[in-house]
Amino acid sequence: MLEGIFDINHIFDEDGIKTLKRFGWDGSVAVQNHNEYSEEIINSAVEYGEKHDFKVFSGVKISTKNQNEMEKAVKKYRNKADILLVEGGDIKINRRVLEMNDVDILSTPELNRMDNGLDHILARLGSTNRVAIELNFGNLLKSRNYDRSKILWAFQRNLKLAKKYDTPVVISSGASDIYGIKAPGDLRGFLNTVTDPLYSKKIMETTSKIIDYRLYLKKDTVLTLGIEIVEE
């Protein structure tokens, strides 16, 4: 069983991976955009991780407002990535993603919206299909004035919905270089300002649980969730 605290970011270079470890992370999900996917890049990041005793898993984020294109991309990249994310914002995309158990994380459901991108129905779908909601801390930090307050409000609203309906939530630094990397304590401290400490702890541990779940499903003896071949 995989344990520890894992960041979600866009860090693939050796210095970045060393920095993540020094800051206190147990591992990370290195995310590529689906239209820039390179097996060579993720393999080199995994090798850097092995060199420094740091777990690196592959992530692919699908970014499109076309639902058919999104579904095709999910099928294409599901077996290429450990963790599959879909960028949200469009309400039809948000809903469809939360209906799909082949997707692990709905990223930024509030993106470019005047609301938080979720309601109680969508939160229930995420809970039923084990699709997590992402809080992208990097996006919050990069925003200014009204946009920052709007994102923060969306985070708070989505946390309330997720907690009520037991929808998984992850928090990510979203870092693309060493200057964007944050320590686990920084993200935990932020979460403590918007929700209770016990729920913050649960959120910090959710990424490793998602990885563990996907690794389990990749086992040759597992046909589907709950159905496993047992050799006598």
UniProtKB/Swiss-Prot annotation:
Would I find DNA repair among this entry's keywords? no
**Which UniProt keywords are listed?**
Cytoplasm, Endonuclease, Hydrolase, Nuclease, tRNA processing
SUPFAM superfamilies per the UniProt record, alphabetical: PHP domain-like
Signal peptide positions on this chain: none
Q: What Pfam families is this protein classified in?
A: RNase_P_p30
What's its catalytic activity? Endonucleolytic cleavage of RNA, removing 5'-extranucleotides from tRNA precursor
**Classification via InterPro entries:** Pol/histidinol_Pase-like (IPR016195), RNase_P_comp-3_arc (IPR023539), RNase_P_p30 (IPR002738)
NCBIfam families in the record = RNaseP3Mthcoc
- In its UniProt entry, what is this protein called? Ribonuclease P protein component 3
Query: Which lineage do the record's taxonomy fields give for this organism?
Result: Archaea, Methanobacteriati, Methanobacteriota, Methanomada group, Methanococci
